[in-house]
């Protein structure tokens, strides 16, 4: 199933307690990040003291939802040394944290004994799983959703295992 950004925003707004996101790729080819990634490679960095220069709609959504008491957590399983893309992503993750997300990083070598799903996913209120399907170079292809309780339980357990071992963003240095 494909999904528009509006549909995804509505889905996030419908969450009552928690939304967790597990990311496991070392690179993404997301259209709306291509320009920023190129600028980052040329030395541009976001200024943490100038939110007007980096605030974006996703951060408004996170702030809106977390203000209602919803917990949004993101965990990233990454290879070390990190790829350029992960270094880029790390450089702006302070923006996610500023909006209310909690973010942790887990070096892949510390995840070898964990049973992780084959794709990145969001888990909403512990019930609905949305898998994000990417092609071999990291371009988003589509999403698959399921409310299967066994799949949701597997994803919840996988996320919590990564979260427990992960390093909070503020303490993970690249």
Regions found by a protein language model. Name each.
Residues 1-50, 54-174:
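PLD/PLD-like phosphodiesterase catalytic module centered on the HKD motif
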């Amino acid at each position: 199933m494909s999904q528009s950004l509006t549909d995804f925003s509505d889905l996030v707004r419908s969450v009552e307690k928690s939304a967790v996101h597990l990311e496991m790729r070392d690179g993404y080819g997301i259209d709306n990040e291509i320009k920023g990634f190129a600028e980052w490679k040329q030395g541009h960095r976001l200024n943490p003291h100038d939110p007007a220069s980096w605030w974006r709609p996703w951060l408004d959504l996170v702030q809106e939802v977390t203000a209602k008491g919803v917990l949004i957590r993101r965990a990233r399983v990454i290879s070390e040394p990190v790829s350029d893309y992960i270094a880029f992503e790390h450089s702006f993750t302070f923006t996610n944290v500023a909006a209310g997300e909690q973010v942790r990083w887990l070096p892949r070598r510390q995840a070898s004994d964990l049973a992780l799903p084959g794709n990145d996913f969001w888990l909403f209120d512990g019930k609905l799983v949305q898998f994000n399907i990417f092609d071999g170079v990291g371009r988003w292809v589509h999403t698959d959703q399921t409310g299967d309780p066994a799949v949701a339980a597997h994803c919840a357990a996988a996320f919590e295992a990564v979260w427990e071992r992960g390093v909070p963003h503020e303490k993970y240095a690249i």
